[in-house]
Amino acid sequence: MQSLQHKTALITGGGRGIGRATALALAKEGVNIGLIGRTSANVEKVAEEVKALGVKAAFAAADVKDADQVNQAVAQVKEQLGDIDILINNAGISKFGGFLDLSADEWENIIQVNLMGVYHVTRAVLPEMIERKAGDIINISSTAGQRGAAVTSAYSASKFAVLGLTESLMQEVRKHNIRVSALTPSTVASDMSIELNLTDGNPEKVMQPEDLAEYMVAQLKLDPRIFIKTAGLWSTNP
C-alpha cells in the first residue's frame, strides 16, 4: 500500500454527492483537493470543508462540456495546488425517457457532459502525468454503461462510451505508469438519484456516496505496480 499524503487530486462534479464525499475522504488521507463544478457556491463550500481537515483546497466553476472553461479551471486549480496526481472524472447528468421522447438536444447534452466532459478534463491533465510518468485517473461510469434499459438509451450510450474511452486510454498510457480505471456503481443515494426518484423512496438502503469514496481511497492506495481496471459496486439489498 502507498500513502496518499501530499498528493493532489482534481475532482469534477465536486460540489455535492459523490464528488463531495470523495473530496472529504481523500482530504482525510492528507490529499490536497481541487474541485470543479458548475455552481461556484457549492464547490466553494466543499473547499472550506476540505480545508477544515488540514489540507489545501482550490476550486473553480466550469461546465465540463466546454473545453475553454475546463482549461481555465484546471489552470486556476494548478496555480494554487501544483500538478495533479489524481483525477476523478465524476461530473455527470442523466435524463430518462423513450428513444423517441428525448429530443436531439437532450441527447447531445448528455453525451457532451458525460463523455466529452471526461475527454476535456483528461486532456487538460494528462500531458503532465505523462511527463512525470505517474498518475491516477478514475472515471465514474455506471451499471447503465454495462446494460441498457428501455428508458436509458441516451444515458447508457454515454456511460458505455466512458467505459470504451477508459479501456482504450488505459492501454495507451499504462506504459507511462499511469493507472486508468472505471467504476460502474449501481444506484448511489446522490442528490441526482434522489431528485430523479431512483432510490425507490429508500435512499438509506442503497449505496451512499461515502461508500464509493471509501472504495476509491482504497484503490488509490494500492502499490503503483498494480491497479484495478474496472470495478462494479452494488447495493446489497436496496
From Swiss-Prot:
Top-rank taxon: Bacteria
Binding site for substrate: S142
Record's keyword annotation contains Oxidoreductase: yes
SUPFAM superfamilies: NAD(P)-binding Rossmann-fold domains
Gene that this sequence comes from: yoxD
PANTHER family recorded: DEHYDROGENASE/REDUCTASE SDR FAMILY MEMBER 7B (PTHR44196), DEHYDROGENASE_REDUCTASE SDR FAMILY MEMBER 7B (PTHR44196:SF1)
Record-level Gene Ontology MF annotations: oxidoreductase activity, acting on the CH-OH group of donors, NAD or NADP as acceptor
Protein name: Uncharacterized oxidoreductase YoxD
Residues annotated to bind NADP(+): 10-34
Similarity comment text for this entry: Belongs to the short-chain dehydrogenases/reductases (SDR) family.
Electron transport is among the record's keywords: no
EC identifiers of the protein: 1.-.-.-
EC top class, as a word: oxidoreductase
SMART domains in UniProt: PKS_KR
InterPro entries in alphabetical order: NAD(P)-bd_dom_sf, Sc_DH/Rdtase_CS, SDR_fam
Keywords of the record: Oxidoreductase
Annotated catalytic residues: Y155
